[in-house]
Amino acid sequence: MKAIVQGKFGPPENVLKVQEIDGPGIGDGDVLVQVRAASVHVGDYYMIAGLPYVMRPLFSALRTKNRVPGSDIAGTVEAVGKDVTAFQPGDEVFGSYKGAFAEQAAFPEGSLALKPDNLTFQEASAMGVSALTALQALRDRGKVRAGEKVLITGASGGVGTFAVQIAKASGAEVTGVCSTRNVEMVQSIGADRVIDYTQEDFTAGEARYDLILDN
C-alpha cells in the first residue's frame, strides 16, 4: 500500500515521503480500515517535527523506523479481528489512533465509531482529537450548563471551532476570541459575540464568565 512515512524529525516538507510499504496486520481486537480521509492536527505536526525538543526522547520511544504519522481517519472497514463485535466489513467509521496517513490503517475496536450518515468522510476525519478535546474540556472538565457564559479563546482553530458549537448546543452564551479574518466564520458557527483580539484586549474588559476555555 502507499503511505506517508517519516524516518527522522524535522519540517514535514523535508522528512515526509510517499512509499510503498506492507499493509498493517490486525490483531484479534483490531479493525482494518480502508482510509478515505485523514486529517492533520497540531499534535501531528509536533510529532513529525519533534517539538518541543525536550519531548524528542518520548517521541523517539513511540516511533518505529519509517513511522506512518497521523492519527485521525475516516474510512470503510475492510476486515475485523475475531474478537471484534461492534463493526463488520463495509461499515463506514471514523476514529483516532495512529498510522493514519496511509491507504489502510489498523485501529483497535475501541478507537473507532460508526460515521454519521450526514457527515462526509472528510468531515468525519476532522473530528478525532480536536472534537474530543473540546468535548472533554467543556462537558467533562468544565461541566458546562445551559445559561452559563462561556469564553473560548482560539475560537477559529481546530479545537476552538468545535468548542463554540458544543458550548452553544449545551445552551451556553458563547463569546469567541479570534483574529479579524475569522470573525464572520466564528459567528457563523454559533458564537453570540466575537472579540477580535487585534482590535480589543479581551483580558482587560469588565465581562465575567462562568467558564473560560483558554485554547
Provide a role label for each language-model segment.
Residues D22-S39, Y53-G99:
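Glycine-rich beta-strand-centered segment in the early N-terminal region that forms part
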Residues A204-L211:
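A short acidic, Gly/Pro-enriched loop at the edge of an enzyme's catalytic core
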